[in-house]
Amino acid sequence: MALTIVWALWAGWSLLGRATPYTLRVLDDSGAPIAAASVDINDSQVGTSAEDGTIEVDWNRSATVLGVSAAGHVPKTVTIAERPDGLFDVVLKARILRGRVVDPGGTPVESASVIAGPATGTTDAEGRISLRGAEPGTVTVSRPAWVPTTFEWDGGVGESVVEIEPFIARAVHITGEAAEEDIDRFFEMAETTELNALMLDLKDESGLVWYDSEHPVAAEVGATRAVYDLSEVAARAEAAELYLIGRLVVFNDPTAAVRKPEMAVLDSATNQPYQANGQYFLDPTDPDARSYGLGLAMEVCEMGVDEVQFDYVRFPDKRTETTTFDGGVSLETRTSTIIGFLEEAVALLHPMGCAVGADVFGFTTAAGTDDGGIGQRWEEVTGVVDVASPMVYPSHYSTGWYGFDNPNDHPGPMVTRALEDGMERLSRNVVVRPWLQDFGYTPEQVRTQIEVAEQFGMGWMLWNATSDVTVDALERE
């Protein structure tokens, strides 16, 4: 009997002294559960909340001071006098970073990425962002083809305004053959001149793929030449602090058009791939043709290219009544097809860290709603891509353009007028980096074009089809 009484007294004392748990739930002030919130009792940490915001907390029969904190939220302290019945909710107020991103001239920068601790978002058309759950400290602001920047945020409620600058690339064109022959000379050229970028042919107008691609279509049509290791070139460019732009010719592709005619623009009169002046085009409305170009773009981005510059991202400009496309060739079809391709490229490449550029005919900067029959309209292209590169070669303008009988004789005024037209018609704040003529000109004429571009605050790329760069037009370092 005595032993029974002692055991009963011990059991009762033990039960009374044992901590009894209850369930705490941590919520955001929007009502959403907060995972990984830190919980402490009387300054001693007891654990972190689960995915549903809950955590089991022991109750020790006395008032406790509960501390709860979570990234991106204002910490909260709660005194609990009695054991809660059921769920005990603690609501944390989310910190909100309100900001605006502008360029050095104060113009809003759309689609800039803002990262503040666990919170990420992008700016709207006015350059503004309201970032819920932001963490005080270093905030990173970036946008493809722009120079990333950081600023310190103290968690305050005012609007933070931060400037971000476009990357001003100064590049020359390197063909696949030139890279195979002597790619070193271009790195040496960059080391001794003002160049800070290289434009390297990945796939050119021949349809040949010059890097070590593993894309199955490139292999199937015999396009892969692999004259350079792209990952090694990218690593070398990064070490030399050079911005690497990869030129990818999309739809002008005689290699794939002839060997995979199901992807090609067809001539209904012959039922063969359509060709004009030696050019064969893949059909921009054909899903497989689009997928080929996008697949190569993703591959080169993974290999270290900073920017993919899509060239010949258009319909063929010389067509007859027998030229046929899977999806038709109306104005609406042409423009929506090209913009759709570029939008898909942005969606695929931005998460991989690559900028998206597009080469466009020079006339598009002044063409208004006319797409020239190729699907390129300046306002629409600049509304999608990170970098728009009009080919403002004076030799490509016919008599009468901007009042000149022979536009090629007036490199400075021609480039000036073309860029003025383009800048007046931008649909948003986007990097404009023109292709400049580096063929048939003296060093002084090439330099004149460079100076015009720089007066607009732009970078530039020199085009020479054989990479015979006019080095004397470049400033020496």
Please describe what each predicted stretch is.
Residues 12-16, 76-94, 152-168:
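Extracellular beta-sheet/turn segments enriched in Thr/Pro/Gly and aliphatic residues
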Residues 24-35, 98-111:
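Structural motif
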Residues 33, 44-56, 80, 108-110, ...:
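Short, acidic Ser/Thr/Gly-rich low-complexity loop/linker segments typical of extracellular
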Residues 65-79, 140-152:
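A short, solvent-exposed loop/turn motif at the edges and junctions
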Residues 167-181, 246, 251-299:
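Active-site-adjacent "subsite" loops/lids of carbohydrate-active enzymes
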Residues 184-207, 302-307, 384-387, 456-460:
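Catalytic domains of carbohydrate-active enzymes, especially glycoside hydrolases
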Residues 243-253, 309, 334-375, 429-441:
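Aromatic-lined carbohydrate-recognition surfaces of secreted/lumenal glycan-active proteins
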Residues 385-399, 411-477:
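Substrate-binding cleft of secreted/luminal carbohydrate-active enzymes
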